[in-house]
From Swiss-Prot:
It comes from Alteromonas sp. (strain LOR). It holds the Pfam family Bac_rhamnosid_C. Belongs to the glycosyl hydrolase 78 family. Alpha-L-rhamnosidase involved in ulvan degradation. Ulvan is the main polysaccharide component of the Ulvales (green seaweed) cell wall. It is composed of disaccharide building blocks comprising 3-sulfated rhamnose (Rha3S) linked to D-glucuronic acid (GlcA), L-iduronic acid (IduA), or D-xylose (Xyl). The enzyme is able to degrade p-nitrophenyl-alpha-L-rhamnopyranoside (PNP-Rha) in vitro. Incubating the enzyme with the products obtained after degradation with ulvan lyase and beta-glucuronyl hydrolase (i.e. The keyword Signal applies. Keywords: Cell membrane, Hydrolase, Lipoprotein, Membrane, Palmitate, Signal. Transmembrane segments: none annotated. A lipid is attached at C20 (S-diacylglycerol cysteine). Gene3D superfamilies: 1.50.10.10, Galactose-binding domain-like, Immunoglobulins, Maltose phosphorylase, domain 3. GO terms for molecular function: alpha-L-rhamnosidase activity. The active site is at E506 (proton donor), E779 (proton acceptor). This is Alpha-L-rhamnosidase. Its main location: membrane. A lipid is attached at C20 (N-palmitoyl cysteine).
Length: 920
């Protein structure tokens, strides 16, 4: 029982809380990390009318381990939370749920701002304090909320064959308005068909954003953003200005021509001002705006770069006193009824860091190459001496070889920026409507009488605004470098959508790459919102017959699908669910999953699939030559049938989670039927592959997807290991096999082979790229070598995250943490120890908090330290061949049971089993 006495005094209130339990929440404990949806903190312009709430406890000084109940209050005012929560009071709900708790109150409407707080009860029914107050402000949730019109420069009026200048020359737009009253609040709701910058009274509202609103299936949905501009509006004349460019909407996409995407960019904005007397004012895009294409940005392309002519600058063009009499009128376009306008589902791409050059080399009197030491994505900012009329050119490269600038792997992407100075002196320039993947920048055309210096240039690192955890470290410097490279690959390719690469004439959201990297990225960064938004786009692009494009958003370039790629419809939602425990991702995706199964079925005969496939993409040492070599040696039908079975299995699991039991029964029958057909079609009685070549990936698919009878699992494992050993313990896997390799070998009891593969120095291996100077993960296992130079194939990205899939095993293998239940409600902790690694440490993010694991090799074994967060139950499982000789809790008290470990810190001492004679 807890006794609380409250004494009121004139000056202050003192609350004494006395707990009779030794296992209770202490007075200062209260929920923290209040978030809504997929991780938004106090969002402005939120997208979900019925939000989901999440929180974590702050119980570092208490002995509580579990939540038994919670209470959420939501009100239209902060004060209302204390007296009358007018939107929702859940009252006390008996539940351990701390994440994705569904709002069940009164309707929340567009623009509305609500305030919320939460408290919880621990396992002894002791209540925490109330959390601090958090808030949510909605964006415009429905198309009907928009009173604005789409506008663009008159000269860009749609035609059947617009010129390149029509599409690629940015449009400058502006309007003026007066404010006569005191402003209480002002919100700017804005978007574009294309990309935009917005200015209010000369202030760049989007200064930290890059290429908003981002890339969605434009015919289905365009995302909108909300900005608080209250402090920028003056009680007099005001001006609202914008620049729009094609971005991903019009002009060049991938290696297609401008005319393949010939709809010119358009702009939509709605400024809503609330005065202190609670009256309102709307300023919208309409036919009164003015426009010009005679601004200084003369050309802009995501792929080809930007051309800036200083002689066209229009000083003060977004200020209210600017003379726009020579500007033209705008045209207005009707809204497309089928296109949804919805608030952005994840944070935009932003400028997140700056890099300075490590070194530079002058290669001619007016040309210098700067080396930033890191392959990255973004744009440069230059500040350097120039001569009037002498063009400054900036070229980009991911690598040099013997001093030569390497751009062959950009293929047809020019990726070049140009700056034309209007006068002698020091010029400053940062590209606005493009982005580049690069480590090196070549600048030519500067004032050759001046000697280059490092501070002429900085690199602006851009990526989707995500939190990176930097949550793994080991005793092996190359393993740490590999983690760092994968981390940079994540940053560079998470550019509003998950790009395959950030530098060449492609930069698309390939689904197969996403399958390989979704789980690793969830361990490495706060990317749930990013992935759920991408998955939403995938569902929108899926056709009625279940067809899923190779890349999302889809552009008409490669108009077929592939097994192992389109299966993102089932793989992505299930991986997200296991990592988060958020059932909504399954609810939203289940119809799409079923539809994809139907499409798979349409491509199969007698349960053997003939679906097109890219195969085990970029498998090393293929037998085929030419372009066919890229697809690897594993039989295509084997691959497609295996992924058919995998998608059925995941859809069955989803049906069970959602309570669709009849569906689950039907899918269970189908799964077993496919497994039998797979076994009979592709293997003989001795489990030798009889269609196509016997490959590591053939056995990996069979084992990872449970397609063999239990009695044959050991046989398949033995054959896989034999193939590895015959390759001198080198992998022979591409995009489909590599993600499965480590886990299958661990399941076979051969983590020694995983470590051998991981630490392999020669081609093909992860350390091979590091030994050859990589600072990000490569597309190919042999993209470059110091001796031979670059792979001759043009498709040779040096920043490709797919092979970063191995980082999943850093968390699930080296640290040994896996979810036993969705959202890590129950977790297995079984670090895979090895004498090849002196120590390893890291944290595994869960909705309830981090699971921390560290281990260190000792003279006779290993010491393992584990921290289990509040509300999670964990089981410690010694790895194969090891025994626990001592286990203690944070008080150094011995513990005898390692199953059902509650929140707290634990230490384990392990030794190698004597019969095994030594550590692996």
């Amino acid at each position: 029982m807890c006794v609380v006495r409250t004494f009121w005094f004139a000056v202050l209130t003192v609350i004494f809380a006395v707990s009779c339990s030794s296992h209770s929440v202490i007075e200062n404990d209260k929920p923290t990390s209040l978030k809504v949806g997929e991780g938004f903190v106090n969002p402005l312009g939120y997208y979900e009318a019925s939000p989901r709430f999440s929180w974590k406890p702050s119980i570092s000084n208490s002995k509580s381990t579990q939540q038994s109940a919670y209470q959420i209050q939501v009100s239209s005012t902060p004060e209302g939370l204390l007296t009358n929560p007018d939107k929702w009071d859940s009252e006390k709900i008996k539940s351990s749920a701390m994440s994705w708790v569904q709002y069940k109150g009164k309707k929340i409407t567009s623009r509305e701002k609500v305030f919320w707080r939460v408290r919880f009860w621990d396992e002894n029914n002791i209540a925490s304090q109330w959390s601090d107050v958090a808030h949510i402000e909605m964006g415009l949730l429905e198309n009907l909320d928009w009173k604005a019109s789409w506008i663009g420069a008159k000269d860009t009026e749609s035609s059947l064959s617009p010129s390149q200048s029509t599409l690629a020359t940015p449009q400058y737009l502006r309007t003026q308005f007066s404010v006569e009253k005191e402003v209480l609040e002002a919100r700017l709701y804005v978007t574009a068909k294309g990309v935009f910058k917005v200015y209010l009274n000369g202030k760049d509202i989007t200064a930290n954003d890059a290429l908003p609103p981002g890339w969605t299936p434009y015919e289905k949905r365009i995302e909108t953003l909300t900005y608080d501009v209250t402090t920028l509006i003056t009680k007099r004349d005001n001006a609202l200005g914008a620049i729009i460019a094609g971005g991903w909407y019009s002009g060049r996409i991938a290696d297609l021509k401008e005319t393949d995407h010939s709809k010119p960019p358009r702009f939509l904005a709605q400024l809503e001002i609330t005065y202190s007397d609670n009256t309102t004012r709307l300023v919208t895009t309409n036919d009164s705006w003015k426009a010009t294409q005679s601004g200084p940005i003369r050309f802009a392309s995501n792929y080809d770069g930007e051309r800036y002519d200083e002689t066209y600058e229009m000083q003060g063009w977004s200020m209210p006193d600017y003379d726009d009499s020579e500007w033209g009128t705008v045209i207005t376009d009707a809204s497309t009824p089928g296109t949804l306008l919805r608030p952005k589902r994840h944070l935009p791409v932003r400028n997140v860091d700056k890099l300075t050059p490590l070194s530079f080399k002058q290669v001619s009197k007016d040309t210098v190459i700067f080396d930033f030491g890191q392959n990255m994505v973004g744009v440069p900012s230059i500040k350097l001496p120039v001569k009037q009329g002498k063009q400054v050119t900036l070229r980009f490269a991911e690598a040099l070889h013997k001093g030569d600038f390497y751009t062959d792997n950009y293929r047809s992407a020019h990726s070049t920026d140009y700056f034309l100075p209007a006068k002698d002196g020091i010029a400053e320039y940062t590209p606005t409507f493009t982005f580049h993947g690069f480590r090196f920048v070549e600048i030519s055309g500067f004032d050759e009488t001046k000697a280059p210096v490092k501070n002429w240039i900085v690199a602006n690192v851009q990526h989707s605004d995500i939190d990176l955890y930097n949550n793994f470290l080991s005793a092996n410097p190359k393993l740490n470098k590999l983690f760092e490279n994968i981390n940079w690959g994540l940053k560079g390719n998470f550019f509003d959508i998950p790009l395959d690469c950030p530098q060449r004439d492609e930069r698309l959201g390939w689904t197969g790459d996403a399958n390989a990297f979704i789980a690793p990225s969830m361990y490495m960064a706060d990317v749930y919102g990013f992935w759920s938004a991408y998955l939403n786009s995938l569902r929108e692009e899926q056709t009625e017959d279940g067809f899923v494009p190779l890349y999302v958003p889809f552009v008409k370039w490669i108009n077929w699908t592939s097994s192992g790629w389109g299966d993102a419809a089932t793989i992505l939602p299930w991986e997200l669910y296991m990592m988060t425990g958020d059932q909504k991702i399954l609810e939203d995706s289940y119809p799409s999953m079923k539809s994809w199964i139907n499409y798979h079925d349409s491509q199969a005969k007698n349960n053997i699939s003939s679906m097109m496939t890219f195969g085990d993409w970029l498998q090393p040492y293929p037998e085929a030559e030419g372009k066919g070599a890229n697809r690897g040696d594993t039989d295509f039908s084997l691959i497609s049938t295996a992924f058919f079975a995998r998608s059925v299995a995941l859809t069955r699991k989803t049906a069970l989670e959602l309570g669709f039991n009849e569906d689950a029964k039907r899918y269970e029958v189908k799964q077993k039927t496919l497994a039998k057909a797979f076994r009979a079609e592709f293997f003989d009685e001795d489990l030798n592959v009889i269609k196509g070549k016997e490959t590591q990936t053939a056995y990996l698919l069979a084992l990872a997807f449970d397609l063999l009878p239990q009695s044959e699992v050991n046989i398949a494992q033995t054959k896989l290991i034999s193939l590895l050993q015959s390759a001198d313990t080198h992998l022979r896997t591409g995009f489909l096999g590599t993600p499965l390799l480590a886990d299958v070998l661990q399941e076979a009891g051969r983590t020694d082979l995983v470590y051998e593969l991981l630490f392999k120095e020669t081609y093909p291996s992860w350390f091979y790229s590091i030994n050859n100077g990589a600072t990000t993960t490569w597309e190919r296992w042999n993209s470059y070598s110091l001796e031979e130079g670059f792979n001759p194939q043009g498709m040779n990205s040096l920043n490709h995250y797919a092979y970063g899939t191995i980082s999943r095993w850093f968390y699930e293998g080296i640290l040994g943490v896996k979810p036993q239940l969705p959202g890590f409600k129950k977790a297995i902790i079984s670090p895979q120890l090895t004498s090849k690694l002196g120590f390893a440490e890291g944290s595994i993010p869960t909705p309830s908090g981090d699971i921390d694991v560290s281990w260190t090799m000792t003279s006779d074994g290993f010491d393992v330290s584990v921290t289990v967060p509040f509300n999670i139950s964990a089981e410690f499982v010694p790895p194969a061949h090891y025994s626990v000789v001592a286990a203690t809790n944070a008080k150094n008290e011995p513990i005898k049971k390692w199953k059902g470990l509650k929140a707290g810190q634990y230490q384990f001492q392990l030794i190698i089993d004597e019969k095994h004679g030594g550590a692996q």
